[in-house]
Amino acid sequence: MAKSYLITGGAGFIGLTFTKLMLRETDARITVLDKLTYASHPEEMEKLKQNSRFRFVKGDISVQEDIDRAFDETYDGVIHFAAESHVDRSISQAEPFITTNVMGTYRLAEAVLKGKAKKLIHISTDEVYGDLKADDPAFTETTPLSPNNPYSASKASSDLLVLSYVKTHKLPAIITRCSNNYGPYQHSEKMIPTIIRHAKQGLPVPLYGDGLQIRDWLFAEDHCRAIKLILEKGTDGEVYNIGGGNERTNKELASVILKHLGCEELFAHVEDRKGHDRRYAINASKLKNELGWRQEVTFEEGIARTIQWYTDNDR
């Protein structure tokens, strides 16, 4: 019998990528619960409704009535992407991040605890670990949590909440923490879409501070394949890091994109973000050694595909 999954935030960047992957590569029935924020893709939800294995429920994970509507059946798993995720927005207005990321996760954990689903996959971020110095080893799953902004603090809070349910209630849950993602469907406010947009308009690319902050980049589809593998083979109660092993400074990243587009290197250094972490790097050896995950898309191929998508979709 085909399995049935609930995907929260399935109209957003990574959630949509995962939803399409599951519909394409499995025979599972998929329900997406999404409140359709500014960063979502409602037009893609309409297209997916043509698939008889797909169902869309508009709702907010922090609202119990919406949770009840979505959990009108028992699922084989809940894959929880839904989150407020933009750091700058969290600095200026933290409340939506607490409401969605913490309270929403609580409501989902309660639903799974009550038997509405067999498993919870909680999608988190490497930002919960804080930042690294240039010569520090990459984050592992046992690195202490040390968030430096309201967004990462809200995600760390939700991680700890899920882990507390695992220890206290034996909740069947797994946490994943991934490095920076890029690819089609990412909202225009994010870094790579911003670089592409400015380059195409002949404008200087804005860089926070000196532009030498380091991030580890992973193509979103590779991230989603890792989540699918963890859903199928991961161990309940565990945390799995997912990373690209592709560290680049923000300035180096911008240079790669500008070169690909044939544009002159024009940068505008702007005031640095409050609480801006200097370096992220993920050690994904646990995922690779225990479950056999390997990324399939090189950085060069992923960037080319991403630029092509934004060119085709005029974003």
From Swiss-Prot:
CDD domains: dTDP_GD_SDR_e. Keywords: Lyase, NAD. Pfam families: GDP_Man_Dehyd. Catalyzes the dehydration of dTDP-D-glucose to form dTDP-6-deoxy-D-xylo-4-hexulose via a three-step process involving oxidation, dehydration and reduction. PANTHER family: DTDP-D-GLUCOSE 4,6-DEHYDRATASE-RELATED. Homodimer. Pathway: Spore coat biogenesis; spore coat polysaccharide biosynthesis. The keyword Signal does not apply. The gene is rfbB. GO terms for biological process: nucleotide-sugar metabolic process. NAD(+) binds at residues 13-14, 34-37, 60-61, 81-85, 100, 151-155, 181. Substrate binds at residues 85, 125, 180, 190-191, 206-208, 215, 250, 272-276. Its cofactor is NAD(+). Transmembrane segments: none annotated. Signal peptide: none annotated. The active site is at D126 (proton donor), E127 (proton acceptor), Y151 (proton acceptor). GO terms for molecular function: dTDP-glucose 4,6-dehydratase activity. It comes from Bacillus subtilis (strain 168). SUPFAM superfamilies: NAD(P)-binding Rossmann-fold domains (SSF51735). Belongs to the NAD(P)-dependent epimerase/dehydratase family. dTDP-glucose dehydratase subfamily. Its EC number is 4.2.1.46. Binds 1 NAD(+) per subunit. It is an enzyme of class 4 (lyase). This is dTDP-glucose 4,6-dehydratase.
